[in-house]
Amino acid sequence: INMTLAAQSHLQLSTEPAVINMSSASALYGVPHLASYSASKFAVRALTEALNIEWARQGIRVVDIMPPFVKTPMLDDAEFRAPVVDRLGGNLTADDIAAKAWQAANENVAVHNPVGGVFKFIKLMDKVLPSASTRMTMTFLSRE
């Protein structure tokens, strides 16, 4: 938050300025076994939404990208692996995320940008179905 605010005056002087926050699929619905992580990503989502509106008047685009789990050493070496990891993803690479970040920086994209086919489908379901459906989906994906 502090770094984003510190950059604001510099962004105002830039051509086509953009802030791309790293949110997560975990910011769509709280993830069992990952409550703290989900809460932090919900905060990123809220910050993105607020600044997207607030800074638009200054010509600064603020968006986020929302990947599910990414295949990195951190994920591979985790002592605990939540059941949802294997069901929702873990097959995206850092290059996939970098490509989405580049797209967000260089194209006119939505405020929230899901990454990966499975999560894009879940996010679409969340928009068109009652919220109870998202809860049921998360319960199913998180079962042990």
Model-derived features: where do they sit?
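Conserved catalytic-site region of short-chain dehydrogenase/reductase
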Residues: A27-Y29
